[in-house]
Regions:
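Outer-membrane beta-barrel proteins
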Residues: 1-129
């Protein structure tokens, strides 16, 4: 089924700066297919600083009762700066009480700096007793 949402608010700091923030999202789970897709768009309008827009997408697929794969992407745009971009790919497998998960994550232009990129890998094991 479809899930949608929207939120907004005003933020005022003790220094007197103000910003307006809003976010909206949509997620759709395809019944019987094991497929879920989602998207989120957020915006922050600052009185005294650059505006920021964020767009994220995600997709997951339950291949069978034991195997799932997922992908996510996020872009953070700041006026007058290099876009920060992040991606992640994940896979998980469960066999009885044993679970294993692997993910690869990459972020480019961290803090909008063109020379600040990172990659990371995670491996997780779980045991249920």
């Amino acid at each position: 089924g479809l899930t949608v949402g929207y939120g907004e608010g005003d933020v005022e700091s003790t220094t007197g700066t103000k910003s307006e923030e809003n976010t909206m999202f949509a997620k759709y789970a395809f019944d019987g297919l094991g497929l879920t897709v989602g998207m989120q768009i957020s915006e922050k309008n600052n009185d005294s600083a650059s505006d920021v827009e964020t767009t994220g997408i995600g997709i997951s697929y339950q291949v069978n009762d034991d195997l799932a794969i997922s992908y996510g992407s996020n872009t953070l745009e700041k006026v007058g700066s290099t876009d920060q971009e992040a991606t992640a790919i994940g896979v998980s497998y469960t066999m009885g009480s044993l679970g294993i998960a692997l993910s690869m994550n990459q972020v480019d232009n961290i803090a909008h700096s063109g020379s600040n990129d990172r990659e990371g890998y995670q491996l997780g094991l779980s045991f249920a007793f």
